[in-house]
């Protein structure tokens, strides 16, 4: 086997890897770099020489999915192999990406956008092939063949690791992985067989986990912190990834509410994450890979976030819990916009519930001391940090240990 990393930066970004097995070429994921703009965010797919015999899509986060339409445009005969749950999410997430890129073109003038259009997304949709878990799929050409099998990775709904068997050798690609069970998905269930090559993620590889850490206790700590803020008359902003993390937190809030342990305040959600609740509900009914029901929205009385944003610096008019994307507080997202209303007010809090890149606005905020200045440049507002900011370690990535 020969591996070529096509990621355009030596960091978490546009995940894409070419794996060659004899004369067969498989591409593992094809993402967009979340911190780069335009064509700079693409993986180096032009380096692929010759045809692509198959694409393995490990899951639907955009740093693994976002450039797939461009890869299929260059290699239209390639099939895209994914879990049954993942095939249900692809079109919605890519279509949303197009809308985001169109807005970016209007706002920044970047003529690269959109990088692809709906006809390109349709090509991806037609190329999708759902592969049942632990059920080998043979891919071959010119007398060469490999056997692929998918295994639950636990990271997010539909996520899988992939075992590739070729010429009596076994190569395992973990994709993004989490071994502990979450509310929407079981923990990773990888094969115990020895492998010749292991290709693994290392998102949290440089971060040690405290020996005393317990995810259940961390969730309890989050609920307690939310209640303390709300009971004192403040509001809580929970920035969350639209796909996966928002649905996890909804179920956590429902569990706390059912037990009588959640402050009786309104809960606001908006955008893609709210829409994706329907898709996870469908995946839960059609596959055994996801555990989610949109009934949670009714049980919690979820309210939509008003499109009429409050003037930056002025507190939100209604005390409550604001569960909004994006998880890293990316500019111009609902979470970023509401943060412009909350940070100046000491009764409020911003609680991060997932991984946050240090170079994103969320990472900057986590590292800021009280009283620091946080700039919302496109809003022409500089907030003085008076709200409480804290990170809760509820990542969907495996611990280093």
What role is predicted for each listed range?
Residues 1-56, 65, 72-248, 254-261, ...:
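His/Asp/Glu-rich metal-coordinating catalytic cores
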Residues 38-39, 183-203, 356-383:
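Short, compositionally biased "basic patch" segments
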Residues 183-186, 209-211, 333-338, 362-364:
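A short secondary-structure junction signal
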